[in-house]
């Protein structure tokens, strides 16, 4: 991880705890705790609290210099990261300071990832973006991808086929422990995925009505709460699925996938990458200026896309109605 140097600027505060020593006469001995981790576009904070009188003060932690993200997933993580490099760099992060990596195995679940790790399987396509283009290598293992960079963030998710099945998460603890051991300085994140598109002729179409898709998304959320949320080692939630559901409630409608499940390369890949940016980079959504060159008209929809992401970050477990 990049160096996280605290600034010298401090602001005084008084703890709500009952002091055991008069702060005016106390010979302070402060204990330090990071209360907000810095990100590439957002400063962090350290809180120093006196163990005798509970007086505290806050110091700012400088932004990190680089951001390196590794997604261990399947086609939905590939969808969500397709535009991520462009979005982060357009917000002002130097291009040479952004690295996006992803391990791709179609339909790969948490249990399957864990089995591949145990058996040192080299079954993945490993794609990496350091300059705006994806370079893909085949026959890669999870171990090799972890060793390729000193990753700042590692993202995991469950596959759509088993995302609502509680038994599918039986090896989540094993996977978390392995990743933390392999990359102890990295922060873990979980992508909350989206559900199927309704009323399509696609082979992926599981539901006939929007009400059925909303019900399924509710099950995705409830399963996350029961099977994932209690893992304190997961530092971040990326509510990409919530952002997609929010956008589906807008005038754009349920037209965001290319085949009933994989998001399309217009609204779909854009809103999911923007959600990753919001969750991991910490920058303002309005600072993102990049648009896919083949979709200049996407600029007209940026207000509702941004609002869908903002609402997802604020209320990740609730579908927020957008402008019709």
Where are these regions (language model features)?
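A short acidic, often aromatic-flanked loop/helix-cap motif at beta-alpha or helix-coil junctions
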Residues: 39, 107-111, 243-248
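Short hydrophobic segments within beta-strands
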Residues: 70-72, 103, 191
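Conserved SGNH/GDSL esterase-like catalytic core that processes O-acyl groups on lipids
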Residues: 78-171
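Viral virion structural and adsorption modules
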Residues: 2-21, 324
């Amino acid at each position: 991880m990049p160096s996280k140097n605290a600034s010298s600027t401090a602001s005084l505060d008084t703890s709500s705890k009952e002091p055991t020593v008069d702060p005016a006469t106390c010979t302070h001995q402060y204990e330090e705790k990071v209360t907000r981790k810095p990100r590439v576009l957002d400063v962090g904070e350290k809180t120093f609290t006196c163990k005798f009188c509970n007086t505290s003060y806050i110091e700012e932690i400088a932004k990190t210099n680089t951001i390196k993200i590794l997604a261990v997933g399947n086609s939905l993580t590939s969808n969500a990261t397709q535009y991520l490099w462009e979005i982060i760099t357009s917000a002002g992060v130097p291009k040479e300071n952004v690295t996006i990596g992803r391990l791709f195995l179609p339909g790969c679940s948490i249990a399957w990832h864990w089995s591949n790790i145990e058996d040192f399987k080299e079954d993945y396509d490993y794609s990496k973006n350091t300059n705006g283009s994806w370079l893909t290598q085949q026959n890669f293992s999870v171990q090799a991808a972890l060793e390729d960079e000193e990753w700042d963030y590692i993202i995991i998710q469950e596959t759509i086929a088993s995302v609502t099945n509680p038994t599918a998460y039986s090896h989540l603890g094993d996977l978390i422990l392995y990743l933390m051991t392999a990359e102890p300085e990295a922060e873990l994140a979980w992508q909350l995925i989206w559900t199927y598109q309704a009323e399509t002729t696609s082979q992926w179409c599981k539901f006939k009505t929007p009400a059925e898709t909303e019900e399924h998304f509710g099950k995705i959320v409830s399963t996350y709460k029961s099977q994932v949320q209690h893992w304190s080692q997961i530092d971040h939630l990326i509510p990409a699925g919530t952002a997609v559901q929010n956008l589906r409630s807008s005038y754009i409608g349920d037209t965001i996938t290319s085949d009933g499940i994989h998001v399309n390369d217009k609204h779909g890949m854009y809103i999911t990458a923007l959600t990753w940016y919001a969750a991991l980079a910490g920058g303002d959504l309005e600072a993102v200026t990049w648009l896919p060159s083949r979709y200049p008209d996407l600029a007209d929809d940026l207000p509702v896309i941004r609002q869908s992401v903002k609402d997802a970050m604020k209320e990740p477990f609730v579908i927020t109605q957008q402008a019709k």
